[in-house]
Amino acid sequence: MSGNMDEAVSGNMDEAVSAGKDVRIARWVATIAGLLGFVLSVSIPLLPVTQTTATLNWPQQGRLDNVTAPLISQAPLELTATVPCSVVRDLPPEGGLVFGTAPAEGRDAALNAMLVNVTETRVDVIVRNVVVASVNRDRVAGPDCQRIEITSNLDGTYADFVGLTQISGEDAGKLQRTGYPDPNLRPAIVGVFTDLTGPAPQGLSVSAEIDTRFTTHPTALKLAAMLLAIVSTVIALLALWRLDRLDGRRMHRLIPTRWRTVTAVDGVVVGGMAIWYVIGANSSDDGYILQMARTAEHAGYMANYFRWFGSPEDPFGWYYNVLALMTKVSDASIWIRLPDLICALICWLLLSREVLPRLGPAVAGSRAAMWAAGLVLLGAWMPFNNGLRPEGQIATGALITYVLIERAVTSGRLTPAALAITTAAFTLGIQPTGLIAVAALLAGGRPILRIVIRRRRLDGTWPLIAPLLAAGTVILAVVFADQTIATVLEATRIRTAIGPSQEWWTEKLRYYYLILPTTDGAISRRVAFVFTAMCLFPSLFMMLRRKHIAGVARGPAWRLMGIIFATMFFLMFTPTKWTHHFGLFAAVGGAMAALATVLVSPTVLRSARNRMAFLSLVLFVLAFCFASTNGWWYVSNFGAPFNNSVPKVGGVQISAIFFALSAIAALWAFWLHLTRRTESRVVDRLTAAPIPVAAGFMVVVMMASMAIGVVRQYPTYSNGWANIRAFAGGCGLADDVLVEPDSNAGFLTPLPGAYGPLGPLGGEDPQGFSPDGVPDRIIAEAIRLNNPQPGTDYDWNRPIKLDEPGINGSTVPLPYGLDPKRVPVAGTYSTEAQQESRLSSAWYELPARDETERAAHPLVVITAAGTITGESVANGLTTGQTVDLEYATRGPDGTLVPAGRVTPYDVGPTPSWRNLRYPRSEIPDDAVAVRVVAEDLSLSQGDWIAVTPPRVPELQSVQEYVGSDQPVLMDWAVGLAFPCQQPMLHANGVTEVPKFRISPDYYAKLQSTDTWQDGINGGLLGITDLLLRASVMSTYLSQDWGQDWGSLRKFDTVVEATPAELDFGSQTHSGLYSPGPLRIRP
């Protein structure tokens, strides 16, 4: 018996010794692996990388041919050039361009590029509009001159005429070497261009070292450190988990039982998210982010494609690399936005299954609270987080962090806290607004610190701290995977210097934008923040006033409010102040709504007066939301009701109705205060659950807006219809935008008749119209601006008058590539005495209309200019002068009988040349002829009109015309709507030369994409303006003729050139290496 007892005691002692040994091992493993993971992670930004180098050398293949090599950084690291003086001797008397880094005829070439030019008397070296050297041509052509050596680098730009000395001034007798020690004088390079022809002469060379500092990949050492850092961190977390288990508590289920319960709220929220995913609006920067993702693989890194000289997104933006991987499957919106849908579902599952129960049994058991959480989540998520912007992912990361912190607090374990730290770090690595996750960490900091202090007596300090350090720094293995600390600091310097990079004290701008009646402050975009604030502050007052509220967990509630307040604080330090950042509040706003619903319910807030006051607040918030337009970004706006006006019902603004109701509720609350009544069945009914009712109403409004848009737009473009067509291979807006490949095709044939001096266009007796009746500088779809604007068309630089008059004697340059030798023009503009002007053109034969003809030729178009009466989606009916299309049928005797007129769709802008659209669906099938009826009855010189003959254009879709292979500069606003077009790629510091440009509507292009992509800010227009000539093409949105969808421009080269062949190499550098600051200043 005693032997058995001895054996049992011995066995227990052995188990204890073994357990103690395991604990000691776990402590050492946690400490060593944690510190190793931490040290390796923080060393990764400093470890070496291999850089791909690229050099542009010219001449190529021994020929003096023009070559293109547009640098995304615009300026090289270094340029050296040697020009033998014999080249100058051999030039013709008028001279010419020896070489330039941009075509001499390119827009602002002298202002940006290097030009070595020879005139009749001088040899000039001009760099960025600075004369670096200017020497008499006879001296350079003389026998003493050997060669011209030019260098441009960080030390400055200099030109040395070897063999010559200066003949005057203080430096007379010294070498003929001049220049400036300015690193910003390095020229922009889009290639090498010359007037020279034939074989390359001996000694002529141009060599540019391209800035490829961001084109790097990790060395074997760095790759090993990254892998070991990740593995060490995982091992440290497993060891920490082993130490956590020493508390003897049974581990919670990974997925608790409550997760398996499905309710009606789940159905509404999940169904709403799914429907919105298909038909809903997208976010503002979707095109921007998608094109970054689409070009990343070819570039070798995630470049900020549209601005900042191609610098990388790091240290923020690892999420974009996920999208880059997804583009290997498809670029379609329905696929590429899938992370947002997944995050939306995760947010709801965590809210309903984890967060609400943690807030207390009163919240978890309240159906109204559950509805409030779901509907506020929906209402806040829908306007912001249905695209590619990362606010949805950040909101999810912050919620996961909060849930993990709460699990750490309830369990007393640190593994959930370590995972929360990792989650917060990765959330912060998405964008600076990821600070909301850091806010969740800080909100739970004190209870976590208590756990560490309590546990350190048993486990020691380092076994607990080291895994947390590794968990917080392992993100560096992702952020600095292919970049170094030097390149990331340079990218940050560039973004900060160019901007936008607003100071913390300008945070008021975010809220200012929110209250403006613009798309940034539209009805839907106000919901997230104002509903969160509406729930936050009353809850705060309740929690401060009452120390104990039955069924509400104070700790989690305070931490939730702390997250929201900390987020509002941290948002002050983000570099931009856009309202789309309010999408961060979607998840925590839903949780706050659930808590507030309980706190202001009749069971908790007994005062009828106070509940009525809160109802007044809810109604006021609704009034504030509706005191704006129902606007949405870009194509999401198509078909939405009240998308450019304040919503009304029966002529009364909805905002005014809610404001009146709010005032009534406030007066009722005041009456309850005076009468001191505490109970009222009517008040109880009205105040039972105002938050979910208000949120549900806003969700219905948003859903209805998009559903109405789909119905109105069908069968042309809407988000919903495009997403459905994507399953059958649809190409978004490219399927619905129609383009005229040649606007000279399709002009109608005039019927025989007696014509006046203007020919068939003028008819028999035109009054006040003349062939030259158009002001100077009237071009297609643009208005003259006093300040230079990037991205403008070549039409601005063409001669004001034609050298050779057109078919009817006009000297007016025509838009859209119209040929003056074939297309007449008549206008009423005059600087002399004004008169009433009238014109009825000859009848033009209208093609017979059948089903095939109806589909192939849906429009009659008149290219016109001036102030014209017409309709558009954006502006409704705009009054001006008359340019109608009159149609005629055959009478009993076969003569033409006028049968009616059609007023045009005119999308503007006024008074530019544009295409007036007359749908053939508004012309009866039996009409056989049409004519132009134009009247300018105004005696103001500013009111004038100009017209060309009618045409039935030959149309192709953009997808048919542009296709998927030609490189296209798609402005940042349009990329998601054109998933099948090929963006212009870049690699090794050089971009492709685009063939086309696709832009958003006129005002978005003018105010957003043209300015954002300006070359002075490191944008792509700095390349195209120098290298190419843009011409706008005639385009229309099918079946939505009054919609300004945007514009398509065709690029033509200034001079013929072929893509340059680059010389590649590789170099290995430490993480601290920098070739010097990238030139970002003019």
Curated annotation (Swiss-Prot):
| UniProt-recorded name of the protein | Probable arabinosyltransferase B
Miscellaneous information on this protein: This is one of the targets of the anti-tuberculosis drug ethambutol [(S,S')-2,2'-(ethylenediimino)di-1-butanol; EMB]. EMB is a first-line drug used to treat tuberculosis. EMB inhibits the transfer of arabinogalactan into the cell wall.
Q: Name one GO molecular function term.
A: arabinosyltransferase activity
Function, please? Arabinosyl transferase responsible for the polymerization of arabinose into the arabinan of arabinogalactan.
Q: Where are the transmembrane segments?
A: 28-50, 223-241, 262-281, 333-352, 359-381, 420-442, 462-481, 522-544, 557-574, 578-600, 613-635, 650-672, 689-711
Localization recorded for this chain is: Cell membrane
Q: Does the keyword Ribosomal protein apply?
A: no
Result for mutant: I289F: Resistance to EMB
The way this protein sits in the membrane is described as: Multi-pass membrane protein
| Cross-referenced Gene3D superfamilies | 3.40.190.160, arabinofuranosyltransferase like domain, EmbC, C-terminal domain, subdomain 2
Q: Name one GO biological process term.
A: response to antibiotic
Q: State its Enzyme Commission number(s).
A: 2.4.2.-
Q: What is the effect of changing I289M?
A: Resistance to EMB
